[in-house]
Amino acid sequence: MYNDYDLVVVYSDYSIVVRGGKVKFIAIIKNSYTLGQVIQQSRLQQGFSQRELAKKLGVSQRWVWEMEQGKQGLLMERLFKVLEKTGVTLSAEFETKDS
């Protein structure tokens, strides 16, 4: 899986892999908090403020903040319960921008 990377660091819920000058973050999403953290890190990496992302999505800045904080709604709660009970692993990844 990681054979073509220069450096791989694996933690319990995420990995950081480096190839050339690019860094890729790969996270296992077990709950809404982890999902929010990945979204936040990706947004920051892309240079967006919460307000800018909200405008792109057509939602309020508060909605983006709540998503990044892992605020659970009924749908999110059910989604993670279904994933847990069915043994499904949800993962997310993003790569740093070119310098």
Language model segments and positions:
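Recognition helix of helix-turn-helix/homeodomain-like DNA-binding domains
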Residues: 58-72
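DNA major-groove recognition helix of helix-turn-helix/homeodomain DNA-binding modules
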Residues: 75-93
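Residue-level recognition of specific faces of alpha-helices
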Residues: 31, 63-66, 79
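Short basic helix-loop element that most often maps to the first helix and adjoining turn
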Residues: 3, 37-52, 56, 81
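Short, contiguous strand/loop micro-motifs
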Residues: 26-27, 37, 66-67
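N-terminal flexible/basic segments that precede or flank functional cores
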Residues: 1-34, 89, 94-99
